[in-house]
């Protein structure tokens, strides 16, 4: 069954609820920097909560922000918007945010992982909301400066004040998202669909599809450079067309030979067996099994990721890719 979603636009949303309120953005990475700058440019009073020893402290000060420790920022804020990595959040929340929360404050997130999987359990006397731009932070900022915005999701997990949705929408407008459109969802749906999309398609699936296509071409005797162009480099051109025009628009833009070959062979390569595998690993997310596995590695996450990344870094496609990027002027 297809569910109808509510979409909110600029002319439907007011930022009045943010007047005289202070938003403390916790973290100054990709999303933290972009959202903090966009909200400030929209007239919101934004402060930052950071680690004094962190590299971002001086950078944020240089960018003109009031910067405090996380504890002090929490005390000063009406909305505490937590934009640090998922596995770091629970410890920071427990030690530096939770002890200083007061009645009527709001906790904000841009991903529902820790709320949905109960790694953070907020007190009942605060609002808990989500404002999740559907683009990397750099793009969130770029599009805002161009006068538009990227689409975003909002959700309410806990509405203590009775104004949680109004607050989430106002924050979405402040980062520019209502210029494009804001979809109302739930913490559960955002978290699970985000993880499933990353694993099956955007990160896991795409890397493996390109890598295996490259390997087949090389194993058949084609030069690695040629294989890279066909399996990887041109993937961006196709994705740009899909992004701008959809599948049908992309197909209209490629040759008839590409159309026929793609439409007849594609479903045989990415067949029902692949879909069954996708469903299997989607269920791991839905059951909480993936979250349990990832959370169990919290203390050694850097080491685990370094080992996994090493396998990719040493693959021939990466060596060839660096050569092609230098040819294209993308790397020095």
Swiss-Prot record:
Mg(2+) 2 binds at residues 194, 230, 234. Its EC number is 1.1.1.86. The gene is ilvC. Gene3D superfamilies: 6.10.240.10, NAD(P)-binding Rossmann-like Domain (3.40.50.720). Residues 186-331 form the KARI C-terminal knotted domain. Residues 5-185 form the KARI N-terminal Rossmann domain. This is Ketol-acid reductoisomerase (NADP(+)). Keywords: Amino-acid biosynthesis, Branched-chain amino acid biosynthesis, Magnesium, Metal-binding, NADP, Oxidoreductase. NADP(+) binds at residues 28-31, 51, 56, 86-89, 137. GO terms for molecular function: ketol-acid reductoisomerase activity; magnesium ion binding; NADP binding. It comes from the Archaea. Involved in the biosynthesis of branched-chain amino acids (BCAA). Catalyzes an alkyl-migration followed by a ketol-acid reduction of (S)-2-acetolactate (S2AL) to yield (R)-2,3-dihydroxy-isovalerate. In the isomerase reaction, S2AL is rearranged via a Mg-dependent methyl migration to produce 3-hydroxy-3-methyl-2-ketobutyrate (HMKB). In the reductase reaction, this 2-ketoacid undergoes a metal-dependent reduction by NADPH to yield (R)-2,3-dihydroxy-isovalerate. GO terms for biological process: isoleucine biosynthetic process; L-valine biosynthetic process. The keyword Ubl conjugation does not apply. The active site is at residue 111. Pathway: Amino-acid biosynthesis; L-isoleucine biosynthesis; L-isoleucine from 2-oxobutanoate: step 2/4; Amino-acid biosynthesis; L-valine biosynthesis; L-valine from pyruvate: step 2/4. SUPFAM superfamilies: 6-phosphogluconate dehydrogenase C-terminal domain-like, NAD(P)-binding Rossmann-fold domains. Mg(2+) 1 binds at residues 194, 198. Binds 2 magnesium ions per subunit. It catalyses: (2R)-2,3-dihydroxy-3-methylbutanoate + NADP(+) = (2S)-2-acetolactate + NADPH + H(+); (2R,3R)-2,3-dihydroxy-3-methylpentanoate + NADP(+) = (S)-2-ethyl-2-hydroxy-3-oxobutanoate + NADPH + H(+). Pfam families: KARI_C, KARI_N. InterPro entries: 6-PGluconate_DH-like_C_sf, KARI, KARI_C, KARI_N, KARI_prok, NAD(P)-bd_dom_sf. It comes from Pyrococcus furiosus (strain ATCC 43587 / DSM 3638 / JCM 8422 / Vc1). Its cofactor is Mg(2+). Belongs to the ketol-acid reductoisomerase family. The keyword Cytoplasm does not apply. Substrate binds at residue 255.
């Amino acid at each position: 069954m297809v569910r109808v979603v509510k979409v909110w636009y600029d002319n439907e949303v007011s930022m009045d609820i943010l007047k005289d309120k202070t938003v403390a953005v916790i973290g100054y990475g990709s999303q933290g920097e972009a959202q903090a700058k966009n909200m400030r440019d929209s007239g919101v009073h934004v402060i930052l909560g950071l680690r004094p020893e962190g590299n971002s402290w001086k950078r944020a000060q240089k960018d003109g922000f009031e910067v405090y420790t996380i504890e002090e920022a929490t005390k000063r804020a009406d909305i505490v918007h937590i934009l640090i990595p998922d596995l770091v959040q629970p410890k920071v929340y427990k030690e530096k945010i939770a002890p200083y929360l007061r009645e009527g404050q709001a906790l904000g997130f841009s991903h529902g992982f820790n709320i949905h999987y109960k790694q953070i359990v907020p007190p009942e006397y605060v609002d808990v909301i989500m404002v999740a731009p559907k683009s990397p932070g750099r793009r969130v900022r770029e599009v805002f400066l161009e006068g538009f915005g990227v689409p975003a999701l909002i959700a309410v997990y806990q509405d203590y004040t009775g104004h949680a949705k109004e607050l989430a929408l106002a924050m979405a407008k402040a980062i520019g998202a209502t210029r494009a459109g804001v979809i109302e969802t739930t913490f559960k749906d955002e978290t699970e669909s985000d993880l499933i999309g990353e694993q099956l398609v955007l990160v896991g699936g795409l890397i493996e599809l390109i890598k295996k296509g490259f390997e087949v071409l090389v194993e058949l005797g084609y030069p690695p450079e040629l294989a890279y162009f066909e399996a990887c480099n041109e993937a961006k051109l196709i994705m740009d067309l899909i992004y701008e025009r959809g599948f049908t628009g992309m197909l209209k833009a490629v040759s008839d030979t590409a159309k026929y070959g793609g439409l007849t062979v594609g479903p045989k390569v990415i067949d029902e067996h692949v879909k069954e595998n996708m469903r299997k690993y989607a269920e791991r997310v839905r059951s909480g099994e993936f979250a349990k596995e990832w959370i169990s590695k919290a203390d050694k996450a850097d080491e685990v990721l370094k080992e996994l990344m090493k396998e990719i870094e040493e693959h021939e496609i990466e060596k060839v890719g660096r050569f092609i990027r230098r040819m294209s002027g993308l790397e020095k």
